[in-house]
Amino acid sequence: MNNLKFMAAFSLLFALIACAPSKNQTSFAYISNQGDHTVSVIDIAESKVIKTVNVGKAPVGVTVSNALNRAFISNVEGQSISVIDTNTNAVIETIALKGDPVGIAIAPDNKTLYVADWFSDRILAIDTSNYKSQREVIVAKAPAGLMISTDSKTLYVAARDTNDIAVIDTASLSVTKRIPVGKHPFGLTLSADNKTLISVNVYDNTVSIINTDSFKVDTIKVGEHPYCVALNPNNQTIYVTNTQDDTVSVIDLASKKTLATIDVGMTPEGISFDAASNHVLVASWGQNQVSVIDANTNKLKATIKTGDKSRAFGQFILTK
């Protein structure tokens, strides 16, 4: 009987350990540098660049896949997508496009890569198994940020010049709804439960908080010329880059109040939250650096020099 009790206790302990979050996770940031056509790979725990990868001309957008061990970089002037193997941090494929890619996102099922073609007003859907099969849908002028629901069935597109969000059914690749927001929406993020979509509206200095069930929209003022947004799912706060006053606004989603305004490098653009370190990383176009914010204190913790004109537009953090 004692042996049975011991085995039961041991089994329970083993199960608890197996289900606990890993303390050995390592996160890496892939920062596109539009001015020198490179990507800086940052070891977040070490706060240093471990490799600089040459990509196509004028890289802007970034998306990563843990399952595929890939980072995808949109090269707006090169009219291509650079595919980086994140195990070796080397470019293994270049996908040629007849267009000008900016926003980019991979579906959670890892089967489809979506690309916003800035000047052709369309979204491209690329099969990640061969990078050859492409579908497309016209959305609106200047499509920018992209977000995809966790079931990979819904794609949200920030349509900058029509001041709305296009909702796309990914199976048919057709627009099913348009959600009016503020002036010139650009960056997007989506909550893990898919119920809250957040749009950053550049020209009226706001973010729109969208209920994806009712499509009710709340509006919150932020800093000057906001650009991108990241969500901290641990405490439901969002971080918004304000490009013209060199700050990040920290906003509580429940109260819709600003908790802090953090000074960062010049012209902050791309921003992502790293769950492994509980840090927020901000790419500064005007200062060629990444600012690291401690999400526990909302204080600036470190800065990391990167390449020329860092943008990192998209979900740029990969955790192994």
Each model region followed by its residue ranges:
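Bacterial N-terminal signal peptides that target proteins for export
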Residues: 1-8
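Bacterial N-terminal signal peptides
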Residues: 8-16
